[in-house]
Structures are given as structure tokens and as C-alpha cells.
Amino acid sequence: MNTVHVNVVTPDGAAFEGDARMVIAKSVTGELGILPKHIPMVTPLDVSVLKLRHEDGGRTLIAISGGFMEVRPDTVTILAETAEMADKIDYDRASAAKVRAERRLQDTKLSELEFRRAELALKKAINRLSIRDMKE
């Protein structure tokens, strides 16, 4: 078998469990492609779209809001704050969140912490919306 078992877990429980030929994830230092028998590693993940390529040529797209990835030769475990499958994303809600975050960022009275939170909210909304353009 030329696959790696993938588990995507959030505080709410398992978001995905299955096998993939390749896992493409964005760490805080850049994009990583994980194949079966990869050397063990742990890396922090950025807000991004996790891409799983399957043996049948299909793919699974999952919007994650950061977290950590543990890689073993036969297993990849993603621990994420949130994880949404592409077909479960409410794009109207994500668009509204983007508009709210953009408005908050225009407020000149925000503290540094509030500004960073608004930036993160915008990044998450843009990430969720970006999957729509990636769908086949």
C-alpha cells in the first residue's frame, strides 16, 4: 500500500480520517508535501487549506485554522483549532466574516491585540473562501 493514514482532529473531535497518497500542508515556514515513509517530524501549521491527494486521483480539501502536524512513516496527524471540509463551508457566512474583519481593521481605535485578532479573523475568512476556487 502506497498511502499514509491521515487523522485531522479538532477540539470538537475527528474532522477527517482516511488514507492519502500525499498530504500537502502549509507550515509556518512554507508548504510541505508528505508522502508515505516520510521521516518523523512535528511542525506548527499556518491558517491554510490542507490538501489530500488520494490513490484514485481524487482529492480532499480541508480549511484549517492553524495547529500542529505530526508525521510518522505511516501516519500523519493534524491537530487543528478548527477544520472544515470544503463541501461543508458556508460561503455566505465566510464572506460576511471577511467583511466584518475588514471593517474592524479600518477602526483606528483598536488596541494592538484587537488589531491582531481582526487580522487573524480576516485570514481565516479568506482561507475558507479560497477553497471555492480550488474545487474541481
Swiss-Prot record:
Keywords: ATP synthesis, Cell membrane, CF(1), Hydrogen ion transport, Ion transport, Membrane, Transport. It is found in: Cell membrane. GO terms for molecular function: ATP binding; proton-transporting ATP synthase activity, rotational mechanism. The keyword Cell cycle does not apply. GO terms for cellular component: plasma membrane; proton-transporting ATP synthase complex. It holds the Pfam family ATP-synt_DE_N. It is a peripheral membrane protein. The keyword Ion transport applies. Produces ATP from ADP in the presence of a proton gradient across the membrane. F-type ATPases have 2 components, CF(1) - the catalytic core - and CF(0) - the membrane proton channel. CF(1) has five subunits: alpha(3), beta(3), gamma(1), delta(1), epsilon(1). CF(0) has three main subunits: a, b and c. HAMAP family: ATP_synth_epsil_bac. NCBIfam families: ATP_synt_epsi, PRK00571.1-3, PRK13442.1. This is ATP synthase epsilon chain. It comes from Exiguobacterium sp. (strain ATCC BAA-1283 / AT1b).
